[in-house]
Amino acid sequence: MFFALLFLIGILLGQVQGWSEPRIRLSSGALAGTDVILESGSPLQLVCEGDGPVTFLPRLAKHKRYISKEVGKIRSFRVEKTTVDFTGTYKCVYMNGNDSNLSSSVHVFVRDSRVLFVSPSTSLRYVRKEGEDLLLPCLLTDPEATDFTFRMDNGSAAPYGMNITYDPRKGVLIRNVHPGFNADYICCARIGGAEKVSKIFSINIIQRLRFPPYVYLKRNEYVKLVGERLQISCTTNNPNFYYNVTWTHSSRMLPKAEEKSTMEGDRLAIESILTIPSVQLSHTGNITCTGQNEAGANSSTTQLLVVEEPYIRLSPKLSSKLTHRGLSIEVSEGDDVDLGVLIEAYPPLTSHKWETPTSHNASLPENRFFNHNDRYEALLLLKRLNFEEIGQYTLNVKNSMKSASITFDIKMYTKPVARVKWENVTTLSCRSYGYPAPSILWYQCTGIRTTCPENTTDLQPIQTQTVEFQKESFGAVGVESVLTVGPNRRMTVVCVAFNLVGQGSDTFSMEVSDQIFTSAMCGSTVAMVVLGLLLIFMIYKYKQKPRYEIRWKIIEATNGNNYTFIDPTQLPYNEKWEFPRDKLKLGKTLGAGAFGKVVEATAYGLGKEDNITRVAVKMLKASAHPDEREALMSELKILSHLGQHKNIVNLLGACTHGGPVLVITEYCCHGDLLNFLRSKAENFLNFVMTIPNFPEPMTDYKNVSTERMFVRSDSGISSTCSDHYLDMRPVTSRPTNSALDSSSECQEDSWPLDMDDLLRFSSQVAQGLDFLAAKNCIHRDVAARNVLLTNSRVAKICDFGLARDIMNDSNYVVKGNARLPVKWMAPESIFECVYTVQSDVWSYGIMLWEIFSLGKSPYPNILVDSKFYKMIKCGYQMSRPDFAPPEMYTIMKMCWNLDAAERPTFSKISQMIQRMLGETSEQQDTQEYKNIPTEAEAEQQLESCDPVKHEDESFETSCDQEEEDQPLMKPNNYQFC
């Protein structure tokens, strides 16, 4: 209809312009009809004349070169010598597009006795879709040919149902083609009694698709965290190439997907991969993959959920036949119970485990676990439950970021059993256990009897008030009723306990008098008083016993200078630190304390498979308290949390499974800095004496020998062996093991100390403490005894709380229920129990005094008593140590500033010492030796402080929160003393 309308419009336009159809004639004259018949080799000249510019449209495009070049109202088509190829229809049209519907045509037959049919010079293979029409250009060169037929090339007739129309001027028209028509065909006709055939036409009909493409998504839902990468694969296939795949989202545009095409038998498979590099909350919704072909479209949809945080959600799934209230389940003996839990989790679960009352047994209940995308179902099958199997059943699950658990409490219906007990002269108690909770009734019968007969008038309920209370015991509920009777009574009582399951009873005969009551009451009272006093004394002694704890603390700043300590037990432990216990060979003990010890060990395969490394191993004693084991695990977690640094004793591994906890750290062969300084004191003095004009210092080290054995050191560990880890001299004449890791070799240190060494020790410790401060870690026990030395005299910070006998170490003073290194502590730590990085700076200043006095104890000749606390509170500072340059003493005084905010940072301290290290090669310290102030001098300095209101106060304060009456205590949130 539409094309007919266009044709009419074209005619009307031509009429409006006054044009008529162009006219075709032969050069020799007018046409006799619409056909022109020529012999092969004859000339052909057609002339077209119209009302405007015209041109010819020949059958073959290559014949356009025979059209005259001039453009005008008259055009000619001229061929000097024709062939059968010129057979066809020639059309004359206006060149103006508006007049394309005005045309004329003529058909030319070029006869040749050898050729009856002409065909296009292009391919004779025709491909059509099922249901379309197909025109085969099988043209006759002679209109007088007869007996035209159309058949297969093999001689068979055309297929049944083929609708054929033949026009000698156009060819064979096949309507509504079908895949059954696929074959090779020829046209046949007779001329002069002989049959002639055309070239072979090959027909290939593509079957019409009756079904949309197959579309498949592996998952019907996805869960992702914000920022994660999403990749969805959509698998499709189709019988041919004529289809496409698209992606759509319920609310937003999606990026272009990548496609991979393969052949699967006779079908084409396209895998479309949609990738979103970083999902956002707005991506939440339905994502659809659609495959479309001529038969229609097919799609598959998946749901995407984008969340901000990981999650684990647990919900119980219990049979409706079970009697339960929430997670509490009531069963009878011999029942079967299925405990089901529905789990939703992302990231995916990494582990799941049931904990049952019989987990210690070799045979556990049957459990099943099902997984579908990010949803799971855990099922525990309990068959024929008995009394030993009742209790709590807990499912623990975790993924890479969270953990969760759910607990079912199974209780078994139990018939009650009653037991009567004589508490004292006038009191009886009846206890019964059962489930549900039993009820108790008392009955009496006169006289002394073994039983009271039932259903008689002698058995009477006791009209007295009873007190009942419930308590859980092994899944059953315990009920106790107390009966009070008067003196001078002879009676038999019956206690009856009953519940839904049944009842139980017990009979008791009693004879009460006042004399028995008085003596029994007095004896019971005395015994209870003695036991109470003994219990109070034992609790006091137990609380006085110190517990092992790592001094290091991780903090987080909240508001200004207010800090909150992070519970180290909540820090994660990375299993990558686990080291095989069988590859660790323990050696001699390097140090031992009240809670544990440090031993030398050899680790095989640490770092690299063929490495043999000397290490130090921390462990607890066999009698260690569970709290102390948790403290060692906290130390392990803190060390793994901090990471590696050259100036701390670094964690190398740990053994936490299959035995006691072992913490593997670097081995520092030269022991602690305090004893190293003392052992090198004489050499240092000799070195100082060689400096021209250096006055002989009046020190306590004139008679120090390098071979001296320290029976008791400030480190707090008794030692008689020269190579003990804490109270040690440098290792001498140790056999060399070529198989050991070179980093673990210990060379004898025979070099004397010099000023550069003291400055380097100070700088390295400052760098280590700066690293700890950057990690929000407070050391709380900075002292020379807690610094170890490795090869090349590299200082490393450690914590010897495990292997130090603080009970017998004079450096640790009792305050409240703890022992603290008071002489190294900042005022705010002593008086307010506040520990910050600035309090570590104060302790570092004390450690500098130790270094530059070659290991002397700070505040010499001053006892830790009320006077000492008063001196500290009033700002007393030690004088410059024997060998400290003035610049270093300035740093010490900066560290001892009473205002914690005014103390320098470790980074600043490190920079100042580094500058001094650069100047020591050009300068010599000529400062004269200064004696340590005596206690009298300290008192004189104290008097200048003029304390007004603290003269009579005791400074033996405690950090225990219960002792709030102490005048120097201030309430705070940092009670770690």
Curated annotation (Swiss-Prot):
Residues 799-821 are annotated as: Activation loop. The chain crosses the membrane at residues 520-540. Residues 19-519 are extracellular. Glycans are attached at residues 98, 101, 154, 163, 244, 286, 298, 361, 424, 455. GO terms for molecular function: ATP binding; cytokine binding; growth factor binding; macrophage colony-stimulating factor receptor activity. SUPFAM superfamilies: Immunoglobulin, Protein kinase-like (PK-like). It is a single-pass type I membrane protein. Autophosphorylated in response to CSF1 binding. autophosphorylation, leading to its degradation. Residues 1-18 form the signal peptide. Residues 919-977 are annotated as: Disordered. The modification Phosphotyrosine is found at residues 563, 701, 725, 812, 929, 974. The active site is at residue 781. It comes from the Eukaryota. Residues 541-977 are cytoplasmic. Disulfide bonds join 48-92, 138-187, 234-289, 430-495. Monomer. Homodimer. Interacts with CSF1. Belongs to the protein kinase superfamily. Tyr protein kinase family. CSF-1/PDGF receptor subfamily. The juxtamembrane domain functions as autoinhibitory region. Phosphorylation of tyrosine residues in this region leads to a conformation change and activation of the kinase. Tyrosine-protein kinase that acts as a cell-surface receptor for CSF1 and plays an essential role in the regulation of survival, proliferation and differentiation of hematopoietic precursor cells, especially mononuclear phagocytes, such as macrophages and monocytes. Plays an important role in innate immunity and in inflammatory processes. Plays an important role in the regulation of osteoclast proliferation and differentiation, the regulation of bone resorption, and is required for normal bone development. This is Macrophage colony-stimulating factor 1 receptor.
